[in-house]
Regions:
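Residues within the DNA-recognition helix of helix-turn-helix
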Residues: 13, 44-47
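Short linear sequence elements within intrinsically disordered, low-complexity coil regions
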Residues: 23, 48-49
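Helix-turn-helix DNA-binding elements, focusing on the entry/boundary residues of the two helices
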Residues: 27, 45, 57
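Basic, Lys/Arg-enriched C-terminal extension of HTH/homeodomain DNA-binding domains
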Residues: 49-72
Length: 72
C-alpha cells in the first residue's frame, strides 16, 4: 500500500523536525533544540519535501498529517 510505503520513507529526524515545525518553532529554534545547525534543519526539511513529492513546508505537513506520521 502507498501509505505503508510512505510511512517508512522519512527518517526519524525528519519527522522530529516537522513535529517541531507544527509547534510553531523556527528553523533557528529547532536547530538549538536538536543541537544541529540551521543548515542541517533546512536540509532535512528539503529532503523530506522531496521524498513526499511536495513543494513547501505547509504541503509537507498536510501530507504527513494524512499519513498519520505527525499529529496536531
Amino acid at each position: 500500500r502507498y501509505e505503508e510505503f510512505m510511512k517508512n520513507i522519512l527518517t526519524i529526524r525528519e519527522k522530529e523536525i516537522f513535529t517541531l515545525l507544527i509547534q510553531n518553532k523556527t528553523t533557528k529554534e529547532i536547530a538549538k533544540i536538536l543541537n544541529i545547525s540551521e543548515k542541517t534543519v533546512r536540509n532535512h526539511i528539503s529532503n523530506a519535501m522531496q521524498k513526499l513529492g511536495v513543494k513547501g513546508r505547509a504541503a509537507a505537513v498536510v501530507e504527513l498529517l494524512k499519513l498519520n506520521e505527525i499529529s496536531l
